[in-house]
């Protein structure tokens, strides 16, 4: 069997297709056309061609639809497959891909349901937020991360990483590079306490922070970036007093 065409066809969605010459291997009516439909981001067309060619050689009447379905379903990041024989000489395949929304550890990604998926190339997803945590806690941690993401977004902050260690202590990292140690006890409250002080500190002071440790009952510890100029804490304290007076009024 010789392939004379395997090309991306322009139509609704994205289509891969190939045309085949008559095959002496096909005892019955040969398959001349295969169309594969889908909005492809991660599925490689050469991989599809390689795994489907042996089945297509079986001919129109003997090609195994279940086998094709299984072969494609086993590819990374394929969510659903629909395979149909189309008279007189074609097979149509529709592929729906998974939609990863975060990275999970070093080698996996999660979809919106919190299901673990193993892609061929994790580097394709380096721009997605990262979660690390105990195995089996993927769905729970994804839901927590969504909440943290929303809270930070309200403060014009972008969450880049969310880490939970074996002791269930939280640590997050923002797209700006700022790291926050939130601890194991009341981590959300710890984060909120820090965020409440941002308006008083001002954007310039927050931008100079390298990390914040919120695991203190009445405050937090700050590690400043190198070459941070001296901060006028007296002015900040005075500003705080004025803000509190205005709130009482």
Swiss-Prot record:
UniProtKB keywords: Cell cycle, Cell division, Cell inner membrane, Cell membrane, Membrane, Transmembrane, Transmembrane helix
CC annotations in GO: cell division site; plasma membrane
Location, primary (coarse class): membrane
Topological relation to the membrane, as annotated: Single-pass type II membrane protein
Cytoplasmic topological domain residue ranges: 1-6
Lyase keyword on record: no
Spans traversing the lipid bilayer: 7-23
Compartments where located: Cell inner membrane
Periplasmic side: 24-249
Domain POTRA: 29-98
InterPro entries: Cell_div_FtsQ/DivIB_C, FtsQ, FtsQ_C_sf, POTRA, POTRA_FtsQ_type
Family (UniProt): Belongs to the FtsQ/DivIB family. FtsQ subfamily.
Protein name (database record): Cell division protein FtsQ
């Amino acid at each position: 069997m010789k392939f004379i065409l395997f090309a991306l066809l322009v139509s609704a969605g994205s289509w891969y297709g190939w045309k085949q010459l008559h095959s002496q291997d096909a005892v019955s009516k040969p398959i001349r056309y295969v169309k594969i439909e889908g909005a492809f981001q991660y599925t490689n067309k050469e991989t599809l061609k390689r795994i489907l060619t042996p089945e297509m050689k079986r001919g129109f009447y003997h090609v195994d639809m279940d086998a094709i379905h299984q072969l494609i379903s086993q590819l990374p990041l394929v969510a659903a497959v629909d395979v149909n024989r189309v008279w007189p000489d074609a097979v149509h395949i529709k592929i729906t891909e998974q939609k990863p929304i975060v990275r999970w550890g070093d080698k996996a990604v999660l979809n919106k349901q919190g299901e673990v998926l193993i892609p061929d190339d994790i580097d394709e997803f380096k721009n997605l937020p990262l979660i690390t945590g105990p195995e089996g806690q993927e769905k729970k941690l994804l839901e927590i991360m969504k909440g943290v993401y929303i809270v930070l977004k309200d403060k014009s902050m972008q969450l880049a990483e969310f880490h939970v260690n074996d002791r269930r202590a939280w640590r997050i990292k923002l797209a700006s590079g700022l790291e926050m140690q939130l601890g194991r006890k009341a981590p959300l409250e710890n984060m909120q306490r820090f965020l409440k002080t941002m308006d008083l500190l001002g954007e310039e002071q927050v931008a100079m922070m390298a990390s914040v440790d919120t695991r203190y009952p009445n405050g937090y510890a700050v590690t400043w970036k190198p070459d941070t100029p001296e901060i006028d804490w007296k002015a900040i304290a005075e500003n705080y007093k004025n803000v509190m007076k205005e709130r009482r009024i």
